[in-house]
Amino acid sequence: MKAILFAAAAATALALAACGGGEPATPVEPTPAADAAPVTPEPVAVAAAPTGPVAMPEPTDIAAYMKARHENYEMLGKNMKVLQDNFKSETPDMAAATAAAVNVKAFADAMGAWFPAGTGPDSGIESEAKANIWTDRATFDAALTKLQAESVKLVAATDAAAFKAQFPPTGGSCKNCHDTFREEKKDQ
């Protein structure tokens, strides 16, 4: 607020000096009124939100398809990191959090198509995707529907209090899928 008032005072002084042809006035920083509300610090950007999902190739090239799926999950993780950092912050950057939430929703909406037949462990290509994604598709789809619903709520949570209330259920729905449908790498 002080900066805005200072800039306005400086601009006015310069304009008056230019119009009057006299000596330029020296801008003076205004002093806050005694009863003025305390200045709330602006939120610090934790990190800019990464992008949303990349386009998937045709599933005829299984290795390329699985690589693109993995890259999408890596990018989803980066968006979740932005959300987690803002969740932990006393002054979350709601612009970055909202952008990341929009991306998470885009991932959740696209994710159901990332698991066509032949792109799982039976492909012979290393994957963190467990076979139960394909053998128990109804449970996978239910978990995905939960993530989609929670991500819609997270996108709608545009103030800090609503965001901090909604991030845990959204993150929990991600964790549920990790626990149920993801095989941790051997080197982790």
Language-model segments: what does each one mean?
Residues 15-18:
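C-terminal motif of bacterial Sec signal peptides marking the signal peptidase cleavage site
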